[in-house]
A protein has these predicted regions:
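Hydrophobic faces of well-ordered beta-strands that scaffold small-molecule active sites
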Residues: 1, 19-21, 39-45, 83-85, ...
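Alpha-helical scaffolding within the catalytic cores
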Residues: 1-7, 25-32, 66-71, 123-134, ...
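Catalytic domains of carbohydrate-active enzymes, especially glycoside hydrolases
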Residues: 3-26, 71-83, 254-268
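Aromatic-lined substrate-binding rim segments of carbohydrate-active enzymes
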Residues: 6-11, 21-46, 90-117, 277
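Substrate-binding cleft of extracellular glycoside hydrolase catalytic domains
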Residues: 29-90
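Acidic/aromatic/glycine-rich contiguous surface patches that form carbohydrate-binding/processing clefts
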Residues: 255-289
Protein backbone atom coordinates (compact mmCIF):
# COMPACT_ATOMS: atom_id res chain seq x y z
CA UNK A 1 0.00 0.00 0.00
CA UNK A 2 0.99 3.66 -0.12
CA UNK A 3 2.43 3.58 3.41
CA UNK A 4 4.79 0.77 2.44
CA UNK A 5 5.84 2.62 -0.70
CA UNK A 6 6.69 5.63 1.47
CA UNK A 7 8.79 3.37 3.70
CA UNK A 8 10.64 2.06 0.66
CA UNK A 9 11.40 5.55 -0.56
CA UNK A 10 12.39 6.74 2.90
CA UNK A 11 14.69 3.76 3.33
CA UNK A 12 16.52 4.59 0.12
CA UNK A 13 16.74 8.28 0.96
CA UNK A 14 18.29 7.46 4.33
CA UNK A 15 20.81 5.03 2.87
CA UNK A 16 19.24 1.95 4.45
CA UNK A 17 20.52 -1.11 2.61
CA UNK A 18 18.32 -3.79 4.20
CA UNK A 19 14.71 -3.80 5.35
CA UNK A 20 13.09 -6.53 7.43
CA UNK A 21 9.36 -6.84 6.74
CA UNK A 22 6.44 -9.17 7.29
CA UNK A 23 5.27 -10.61 3.98
CA UNK A 24 1.67 -10.27 5.16
CA UNK A 25 2.18 -6.51 5.37
CA UNK A 26 4.12 -5.91 2.15
CA UNK A 27 2.56 -6.28 -1.29
CA UNK A 28 4.25 -7.01 -4.61
CA UNK A 29 4.28 -3.33 -5.58
CA UNK A 30 6.26 -2.51 -2.46
CA UNK A 31 8.73 -5.34 -3.07
CA UNK A 32 9.28 -4.05 -6.59
CA UNK A 33 9.92 -0.57 -5.18
CA UNK A 34 12.51 -1.96 -2.77
CA UNK A 35 14.22 -3.95 -5.53
CA UNK A 36 14.34 -0.99 -7.91
CA UNK A 37 15.99 1.10 -5.22
CA UNK A 38 18.62 -1.54 -4.50
CA UNK A 39 17.37 -2.34 -1.00
CA UNK A 40 17.66 -5.91 0.23
CA UNK A 41 14.49 -7.35 1.75
CA UNK A 42 14.60 -9.96 4.48
CA UNK A 43 11.24 -11.51 5.37
CA UNK A 44 10.70 -11.77 9.11
CA UNK A 45 9.14 -14.91 10.53
CA UNK A 46 7.91 -13.98 14.01
CA UNK A 47 5.86 -15.33 16.87
CA UNK A 48 5.17 -11.82 18.17
CA UNK A 49 1.43 -11.08 18.29
CA UNK A 50 0.74 -14.68 17.27
CA UNK A 51 -0.38 -17.54 19.50
CA UNK A 52 2.01 -20.08 17.99
CA UNK A 53 2.79 -23.41 19.66
CA UNK A 54 6.48 -23.45 18.80
CA UNK A 55 7.03 -26.86 20.39
CA UNK A 56 4.35 -28.36 18.15
CA UNK A 57 5.99 -26.83 15.08
CA UNK A 58 9.65 -27.35 15.95
CA UNK A 59 9.51 -30.47 18.12
CA UNK A 60 8.41 -32.91 15.40
CA UNK A 61 10.99 -33.60 12.70
CA UNK A 62 8.52 -33.85 9.82
CA UNK A 63 6.63 -30.72 10.85
CA UNK A 64 9.83 -28.75 11.38
CA UNK A 65 11.23 -29.71 7.99
CA UNK A 66 7.96 -28.88 6.27
CA UNK A 67 8.09 -25.48 7.97
CA UNK A 68 11.65 -24.94 6.72
CA UNK A 69 10.62 -25.90 3.19
CA UNK A 70 7.68 -23.49 3.31
CA UNK A 71 9.83 -20.58 4.53
CA UNK A 72 12.45 -21.03 1.85
CA UNK A 73 9.87 -21.57 -0.89
CA UNK A 74 8.10 -18.34 0.09
CA UNK A 75 11.36 -16.38 0.09
CA UNK A 76 12.20 -17.66 -3.37
CA UNK A 77 8.67 -17.07 -4.67
CA UNK A 78 8.83 -13.40 -3.66
CA UNK A 79 12.43 -13.04 -4.84
CA UNK A 80 13.64 -12.00 -1.39
CA UNK A 81 17.21 -11.65 -0.23
CA UNK A 82 16.97 -13.26 3.17
CA UNK A 83 14.96 -14.59 6.09
CA UNK A 84 14.95 -13.14 9.59
CA UNK A 85 13.78 -15.34 12.47
CA UNK A 86 12.21 -13.43 15.35
CA UNK A 87 10.96 -16.01 17.86
CA UNK A 88 10.60 -14.33 21.23
CA UNK A 89 8.64 -16.96 23.18
CA UNK A 90 10.93 -19.98 22.95
CA UNK A 91 10.62 -22.01 26.16
CA UNK A 92 13.59 -23.71 27.78
CA UNK A 93 12.35 -27.16 26.82
CA UNK A 94 12.02 -26.06 23.18
CA UNK A 95 15.57 -24.70 23.01
CA UNK A 96 17.22 -27.80 21.43
CA UNK A 97 14.49 -28.06 18.79
CA UNK A 98 14.82 -24.34 18.05
CA UNK A 99 18.55 -24.67 17.46
CA UNK A 100 17.99 -27.72 15.26
CA UNK A 101 15.43 -25.73 13.27
CA UNK A 102 18.05 -23.03 12.65
CA UNK A 103 20.60 -25.65 11.56
CA UNK A 104 18.19 -27.16 9.05
CA UNK A 105 17.00 -23.77 7.83
CA UNK A 106 20.57 -22.54 7.36
CA UNK A 107 21.38 -25.46 5.07
CA UNK A 108 18.56 -24.50 2.75
CA UNK A 109 19.06 -20.74 2.90
CA UNK A 110 22.74 -21.08 2.05
CA UNK A 111 21.97 -23.53 -0.75
CA UNK A 112 19.56 -21.00 -2.24
CA UNK A 113 21.66 -17.86 -1.78
CA UNK A 114 19.53 -16.42 1.02
CA UNK A 115 20.85 -14.56 4.06
CA UNK A 116 19.72 -15.97 7.41
CA UNK A 117 19.58 -13.74 10.48
CA UNK A 118 18.16 -14.40 13.94
CA UNK A 119 16.88 -11.88 16.50
CA UNK A 120 17.86 -12.38 20.13
CA UNK A 121 17.29 -10.74 23.46
CA UNK A 122 20.29 -9.30 25.22
CA UNK A 123 21.57 -12.46 26.99
CA UNK A 124 20.34 -13.36 30.45
CA UNK A 125 20.29 -16.65 32.33
CA UNK A 126 16.61 -17.06 31.46
CA UNK A 127 17.32 -16.98 27.70
CA UNK A 128 20.45 -19.14 27.63
CA UNK A 129 18.44 -21.92 25.95
CA UNK A 130 18.29 -19.85 22.75
CA UNK A 131 21.73 -21.30 22.01
CA UNK A 132 23.46 -18.18 20.77
CA UNK A 133 26.78 -19.96 20.34
CA UNK A 134 25.18 -22.58 18.10
CA UNK A 135 23.34 -19.84 16.23
CA UNK A 136 26.64 -18.13 15.56
CA UNK A 137 27.97 -21.27 13.88
CA UNK A 138 25.16 -21.69 11.37
CA UNK A 139 23.43 -18.36 10.66
CA UNK A 140 24.85 -15.37 8.80
CA UNK A 141 23.94 -12.75 11.40
CA UNK A 142 22.90 -12.80 15.05
CA UNK A 143 20.92 -9.66 15.86
CA UNK A 144 20.92 -8.45 19.46
CA UNK A 145 17.80 -6.49 20.31
CA UNK A 146 19.62 -3.84 22.32
CA UNK A 147 16.45 -2.28 23.70
CA UNK A 148 13.47 -3.09 25.93
CA UNK A 149 15.69 -3.03 28.99
CA UNK A 150 12.51 -1.73 30.60
CA UNK A 151 9.67 -2.88 28.39
CA UNK A 152 6.05 -1.87 28.06
CA UNK A 153 4.79 -4.28 30.69
CA UNK A 154 7.43 -3.39 33.26
CA UNK A 155 6.26 -2.31 36.70
CA UNK A 156 9.51 -0.39 37.17
CA UNK A 157 10.20 2.82 35.23
CA UNK A 158 13.56 2.95 33.52
CA UNK A 159 15.62 3.35 30.39
CA UNK A 160 14.78 1.48 27.22
CA UNK A 161 18.50 1.07 26.48
CA UNK A 162 21.08 2.30 28.97
CA UNK A 163 24.68 2.13 27.83
CA UNK A 164 25.60 -0.67 30.25
CA UNK A 165 22.65 -2.71 29.01
CA UNK A 166 23.69 -2.21 25.38
CA UNK A 167 27.36 -3.02 25.91
CA UNK A 168 26.55 -5.92 28.20
CA UNK A 169 24.26 -7.44 25.58
CA UNK A 170 26.97 -7.21 22.94
CA UNK A 171 29.76 -8.56 25.11
CA UNK A 172 27.74 -11.45 26.55
CA UNK A 173 26.65 -12.46 23.05
CA UNK A 174 30.28 -12.51 21.92
CA UNK A 175 31.23 -14.46 25.07
CA UNK A 176 28.52 -17.00 24.19
CA UNK A 177 30.40 -17.77 20.98
CA UNK A 178 29.10 -15.35 18.36
CA UNK A 179 31.90 -13.80 16.31
CA UNK A 180 31.77 -9.97 16.29
CA UNK A 181 31.70 -9.97 12.49
CA UNK A 182 28.40 -11.88 12.66
CA UNK A 183 26.82 -9.68 15.32
CA UNK A 184 24.41 -6.86 14.51
CA UNK A 185 23.24 -4.65 17.36
CA UNK A 186 19.78 -3.14 17.10
CA UNK A 187 19.25 0.30 18.63
CA UNK A 188 15.96 1.97 19.60
CA UNK A 189 14.50 4.82 17.58
CA UNK A 190 11.90 5.16 20.33
CA UNK A 191 11.63 5.94 24.01
CA UNK A 192 9.04 5.48 26.74
CA UNK A 193 7.21 8.05 28.80
CA UNK A 194 6.64 6.47 32.20
CA UNK A 195 3.65 7.40 34.33
CA UNK A 196 3.25 6.51 38.00
CA UNK A 197 -0.15 7.21 39.47
CA UNK A 198 -1.71 5.65 42.54
CA UNK A 199 1.20 3.25 42.80
CA UNK A 200 0.57 1.91 39.29
CA UNK A 201 3.31 2.20 36.66
CA UNK A 202 2.44 2.41 32.96
CA UNK A 203 4.23 3.64 29.86
CA UNK A 204 3.74 4.82 26.30
CA UNK A 205 6.25 4.27 23.50
CA UNK A 206 6.96 7.30 21.31
CA UNK A 207 9.27 8.07 18.43
CA UNK A 208 12.01 10.66 18.90
CA UNK A 209 10.12 13.68 17.59
CA UNK A 210 6.97 12.83 19.50
CA UNK A 211 8.96 12.39 22.71
CA UNK A 212 10.70 15.74 22.22
CA UNK A 213 7.32 17.39 21.58
CA UNK A 214 5.98 15.96 24.85
CA UNK A 215 9.03 17.25 26.72
CA UNK A 216 8.64 20.74 25.25
CA UNK A 217 4.88 20.94 25.76
CA UNK A 218 5.19 19.97 29.41
CA UNK A 219 8.25 22.08 30.18
CA UNK A 220 10.30 19.09 31.30
CA UNK A 221 13.96 19.86 32.00
CA UNK A 222 16.32 17.26 30.55
CA UNK A 223 19.60 16.53 32.34
CA UNK A 224 22.36 14.27 31.00
CA UNK A 225 22.62 11.08 33.05
CA UNK A 226 26.15 9.65 32.98
CA UNK A 227 24.93 6.29 34.24
CA UNK A 228 22.59 5.59 31.33
CA UNK A 229 24.24 7.97 28.83
CA UNK A 230 20.85 9.50 28.07
CA UNK A 231 19.03 12.71 28.87
CA UNK A 232 16.62 12.19 31.76
CA UNK A 233 13.60 14.24 32.76
CA UNK A 234 10.79 14.06 35.27
CA UNK A 235 7.65 16.03 36.03
CA UNK A 236 4.60 16.06 38.25
CA UNK A 237 1.58 16.61 36.03
CA UNK A 238 -1.79 16.57 37.70
CA UNK A 239 -1.78 13.67 40.11
CA UNK A 240 0.78 11.64 38.19
CA UNK A 241 4.58 11.44 38.22
CA UNK A 242 6.23 11.20 34.79
CA UNK A 243 9.75 10.10 33.87
CA UNK A 244 11.59 9.86 30.56
CA UNK A 245 14.99 8.63 29.43
CA UNK A 246 15.11 10.08 25.95
CA UNK A 247 16.84 8.80 22.82
CA UNK A 248 18.41 11.47 20.61
CA UNK A 249 21.70 12.24 18.86
CA UNK A 250 24.02 11.98 21.88
CA UNK A 251 22.56 8.77 23.27
CA UNK A 252 22.64 7.11 19.85
CA UNK A 253 26.22 8.28 19.28
CA UNK A 254 27.27 6.72 22.59
CA UNK A 255 25.72 3.40 21.59
CA UNK A 256 27.45 3.47 18.21
CA UNK A 257 30.77 4.19 19.92
CA UNK A 258 30.35 1.07 22.05
CA UNK A 259 29.46 -0.96 18.97
CA UNK A 260 32.53 0.32 17.16
CA UNK A 261 34.82 -0.52 20.06
CA UNK A 262 33.44 -4.07 20.06
CA UNK A 263 33.87 -4.32 16.25
CA UNK A 264 30.38 -5.64 15.54
CA UNK A 265 29.17 -6.19 11.98
CA UNK A 266 26.65 -3.38 11.88
CA UNK A 267 23.61 -1.62 13.22
CA UNK A 268 19.89 -2.28 12.98
CA UNK A 269 17.07 -0.22 14.44
CA UNK A 270 13.48 -0.45 15.64
CA UNK A 271 11.88 1.10 13.86
CA UNK A 272 12.20 3.10 10.66
CA UNK A 273 10.17 6.30 10.85
CA UNK A 274 10.55 6.81 14.60
CA UNK A 275 13.92 8.54 14.27
CA UNK A 276 14.87 12.21 13.97
CA UNK A 277 16.44 13.12 10.61
CA UNK A 278 19.66 14.13 12.37
CA UNK A 279 20.22 10.53 13.50
CA UNK A 280 21.16 9.48 9.99
CA UNK A 281 24.28 11.62 9.85
CA UNK A 282 25.49 9.87 12.98
CA UNK A 283 24.77 6.46 11.50
CA UNK A 284 26.48 7.40 8.22
CA UNK A 285 29.60 8.42 10.13
CA UNK A 286 29.55 5.11 12.01
CA UNK A 287 29.16 3.10 8.80
CA UNK A 288 32.04 4.93 7.14
CA UNK A 289 34.43 4.85 10.10
Amino acid sequence: DEDNIKIARMAKEKGVNRVIARLSEVDSKTLTEFNEKGIEVWAVCTDVDNSVDLEAVLGVTETRRAFVDRLVASALEYDLDGINIDFETVKAETGPDYVQFLRELSIQTHANGLVLSVDNYAPTASTEHYGRGEQGLVVDYVVVMGYDEHWGGSDIAGSVASIDFVEGGIQRTIAAGVAPEKLINAIPFYTRIWKTEGGVVSSEALGMNAAKKWVDENGVELIWDNTTCQYYGEAQIGGAYYQIWIEEEESIQTKLNVMQSNQVAGVAAWKLGFEKPEIWQIIYAYQNS
